[in-house]
Each structure stands twice: as C-alpha cells, then as structure tokens.
Amino acid sequence: GENQSSHYNKFYFVKILKIVEISYKSVRPSLSIFDLWADLLRRSAVSSNFGLIMEEISIDIFNLLDKQPEPARGNVLLAKPTVDDACFKRSVILLVDHDSEGSMGVIVNRLTDYTLADVIDGPDYFQEIPLYMGGPVGLNQMFFLHTLGPDVIPNCIQVARGLYFGGDYEAVKRYVACGEPVEGKMKFIVGYSGWEKGQLADEISRFDWVIQKHIDEALIMGDQEADDMWKAAVESFGEKYRTWNNWPTNPSDN
C-alpha cells in the first residue's frame, strides 16, 4: 500500500545517500554533505523512481572521472554499473579489433548453459568445457581466446601480451581432442560485440564504458561468475572506481 511504499522510499533514500556520498567524495572530495543532501532532496521532489534518480546521479559522478583514452585492440571495456541492457549489464569486454571503421570485442564473463560438446563432436570431456556468450552479433559463430600462441594455434591474432584470438580451427580441435589443458588457457565464445564507425566512441563519451589499457590475463581467462569478474575488474581500475561495487545490481527494482 501507500504507507509501505513510503517506508521503502525512505529506506532506499538513505541507502542511496550513503552510496552516492562515497561515490561523489571519491571524485570530488570538496563536496559538502549539505550540498549532497540538497541535490538528493531536489531530485526526489520530482521523482519517486529511485532507479531514475540513481541513473541521473551516476551521469554526474561518471562525468567527473578521468577522460578516457582512445580504444585500441587489447583494451578491456568495463560496463558502468547503471548499464541495464541484458547483454551488456556488468560486462567485461576484450577488444580484439579496432580501427577507424569500427570495433569488435568479446564479453569474457558471460557464461552460457552450453558446453563445447553442444557445438563440436568429440570425447565425453567436451561436456566439461564451457561456452561463453561474446555478444549479440554472430551467434551462429564460435570464436576462441587463448594463451597458446601461433606455435600451437597457427594464424591466430595477438591481441595483447600473451593473449591471442582465433587461429586455425583444425589445430584447436586437435589440441582439445588430445586432452590438453583448457582451463585458464582457452575460452570458447559464441557471438561477439560489434560497433560501427564512431559508435563505440559515442558510448565511451557517455561513460557507458571505461577503458583499461593494461589487461590482467589471469582475470580475462578466469572462470569467475559474471558479477565476481566484473567486481574484480572494477578493483583493478583503481580507487576512483571502487565505489561502483557498492552500486545495487538492480537499482530500478527499488
């Protein structure tokens, strides 16, 4: 009822205040707590939707963060916590290609319910090798990210130090079929994330993404749950971004 709604609104207002106070202070230490209260009161006076209030505040906070570098192959894109697209929410994306005509990346923390056995005939242990969803484009295509290099997988592309993308499909099949280790060395990915000319730059300018130039190979090739990998990536981005881990997973549900 109305009283219950009012109770929840008060509860989440206090909750939001604490999160936003920490976030604002991390990027604007001179901010007065009284100014913060006034800002939140002003916003709540025109909207009872706390998801919307947090989205507005997030824009203010993220616009105070450091200017983002130009994206390049091998960079990691980290979705800001208020991105609510089902595919990209709390995603960690490795850019495998970028030029003036567009960009291509793969989400590395979106595990599916499928295994390699669902797409390739092979030994029973193929059922133990997970498939990841790399993005909404080309879902009928499978890609592989690995640390093996061209000596093992010819024709692969080096995307970062010690990290490779693609290569000779038959060589990959032979490697896996022989029972060679896969965990931490290979990720099989269905689909990819693509951006047309200028599209990624626009999204970065809105702070939908932040860029990490120096990637953690162990993190990218790890098998953490999606949210855990995203939080670990946030930690690697430094102090200004750590308050993102305080952000509710589903603020609009509030």
Locate predicted features:
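Short, charge-rich patches within N-terminal targeting peptides
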Residues: E2-Y8
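Polybasic, lysine-rich low-complexity intrinsically disordered segments
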Residues: N3, I16-I22
